[in-house]
Each structure stands twice: as C-alpha cells, then as structure tokens.
Amino acid sequence: MNNLPRYQFQNRAAGGNCIGMLLTGGKSKRFGSDKLVHTIEGQTVAELSAHALSLACDTCFEVGLGLTGLPVIHDSSGQGPLAAIAQSVMYLRDQKILEFGQCALVLAGDVPLITASTLRIVANWPGRSSLVPVVNGREQYLAARWSPESLDRSIFLTKNGLMKVSKALDVSGTQRLSMDAWESQDNQEFLDIDTPDELRKLVNAELICIPDRRSQS
C-alpha cells in the first residue's frame, strides 16, 4: 500500500459531475435491528450519511427505504448493494439523469462520521476512473467514486448472478487512494456501524460533531 497516491485534505467545491448514491437497503443482521434509523444527537445514522453526501454532490439519490429525505430509488431486488447500484444506474440512465459517461459517488448509509470535504476529494479526484479510498489497508468500495465502466460492470455482473461489489471495480484504470490522515486511531471517519456496541462506543467517544458538518455547506 505504500505506493498508493496520497492527498492533502482540504475543503473543495461540490463534487464535480458525480451523481451521489446513498445505499440504505441493508438488512442489519449483525446489529439486530435497523441500524440506519438509530439516532445520534437527533439525527439518524442514515441522515448523517445523507447530509455529507448531499453537500458533496449536487444531485443525490437514496437507494433503498426512503429514510433520509433524498429522492428515493426503491431497491426492489433485495440482493445486496451491487444489485441496488445496478438497478439505480439503469433507472437513472433511463430517466436521462445519469449520462452514460458520468461517474457516481457511492456511499453506504451506515458511515455517520464521513464528512463532505472527504467525499468531495474522492468525487473531484482528477480523471473519470473509479477511485477507491484505502483506510488502514481496507478498500472502501462503498465510499468510492465509480467510473462509467464500473457502473456498466455492476449491471453485467448482477445479470449474471455475481454480487461481489469489488468485482465491479476490477476494471482498467481503477485507482486506490491512501487516506493517510486516517492512520491515527482517533480518526475513524470511514467507520461503518455493524453492532450496537460499535454505535455506543462511537457516541460515548463523541466522535460525531454535527455542527462541523453543517459548517461545510
């Protein structure tokens, strides 16, 4: 991972020409209930994720259950995130909202610490290739910019019954971005919430600062 490109983190303008896609259709099996509707300082986990995405992209959609106030594309497949992405791509292209040469900024709904400034960096990275943040050696496929080729591949894979998200990003030109600002244990911006204990630790550590999010608009 040492050869990955690095970037100086700074506030940037809204996310280029990317369409924002927030995924809220997960079943939260490990959490035991719908983790996306749990509240933190008066906002749900999904709303916090949606707020950051909406500040990073001019046009955003929620793909799933309609939990955030964003325009909703209902996930009728129930087959996981890749199928939800593929369904959304087909719908948005059919409605002439997403152009065939346009990228999407894809974000899971359970990352309430993510900030608009970080998402802008991913969305605005030079070029139109897929860009996958790498945090502590882990590739963040669902906090990534998906190229037109990766979006096309999501459709191809799901039509053939292949649902592994990483395979859609296995296309020529995909870049990995080392997020070196996350080497500190104190910064957990890409943390996704899979269990009630993880949510309690996050809240008790006071890692979320909602006023800071609003100041990024």
Where on the chain are the PLM-derived regions?
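Nucleotide and nucleotide-moiety/phosphate-recognizing core
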Residues: N3-V165, D170-Q188, D197-I210
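Long, low-complexity, intrinsically disordered segments
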Residues: I210-S217
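Dinucleotide-binding Rossmann-like beta1-alpha1 core, especially the glycine-rich loop
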Residues: L191
